[in-house]
Amino acid sequence: MEGGKIAIIIATKDRLEILRETLQSIRRQTRLAAYVYVSVSSLEDAPSGNSTEGVIVLVGPPGGSAQRNTAIRQVPLDVEYMVFFDDDMELHPSYLENAVSFLEKNSDVVAISGMMIADGNISREAARALLEQDTAWAGDPSLRDRGRHHTLYACNAVIRSRPLRQTLFDENLPLYSYGEDYELSLRLKKFGRVGRLSNAVGVHLQTQAARVSGKRYGYAMIANNWYFLQKGVCHIAAPWSYVRFVLVIVLKRLWINLQNGFSGQLERDPWGQIQGNLVALVDIICGRSSPRRILDL
């Protein structure tokens, strides 16, 4: 198919079987990418055998943001669109075709994420069946760039290459790089619109294998958002950005974790998250908060 070249980038760690099935989903796309990069911090995480067909493996520093940037720096300059997928995605075969076609027709849009018709607590088989059966999304494409859809969702994102090369992901966000999609979205908005595209669809399995601990995740949730405020990266101007931080980021998150803990919903380690939340708050009060402190927990 004619059109701009596409490069797909997947950052992964310790999830070889999950990655293999996601690569199969990518190969079923009606519009294929010119390059598929798998970015790892160790060759132990790299695919092998039939999974490597058409795949370029890159090894670099660990962490979601760092691994993505390793790949971005290797993408040839004639590639117009870079696409990011988590390693636990199942895509409708039309995802790439619909997403890139929309960007080609709308020059004022710099980046999009698709719409997830399911997000978490779903098997690969159920995801495939759902994508075959659910056609509610079909029709004329529309970009949703208001409310909760105003930023990218990094499990799936299609971004114009030129502005992305100028921004990159923030490598001060280590490990799982919590909030990197929100932060990048706000910096990309100076180049154009960012939003969610109605007819680029998929399922995010949210497989928990090899994710960071609850304590680290809880720390990052608070500390990373505080870091964004200190950088001046927020969709709400001060002082309301700080009000949002207290009410939505801190108090709401603590309340949700307490509810999950007392109700026995322990899949995501709510008690560990609460510990991390509280450590982050103490660090903020003591003036030592940093996203990289997660490495010490």
Question: What are the functions of these language-model segments?
Answer:
Residues Q24-A33:
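Short, acidic, metal-binding catalytic loop of nucleotide-sugar glycosyltransferases
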Residues S65-Y81:
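Active-site nucleotide-sugar/metal-binding loop of Leloir-type enzymes
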Residues V79-E90:
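Short beta-strand-to-loop acidic/aromatic patch adjacent to the donor-nucleotide binding site
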Residues S94-A127:
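Conserved donor NDP-sugar-binding/catalytic core segment of glycosyltransferases
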Residues G114, L130-H149:
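Short, flexible, basic/aromatic active-site loop/helix in glycosyltransferases
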Residues L152, N156-T167, P174-A200:
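A short, conserved alpha-helix in the catalytic core of glycosyltransferases
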Residues Y176-S177, V203-Y227:
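Nucleotide-sugar-dependent glycosyltransferase catalytic core
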Residues R216-N224, I236-L297:
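Non-catalytic, C-terminal membrane-associated alpha-helical segments of glycosyltransferases
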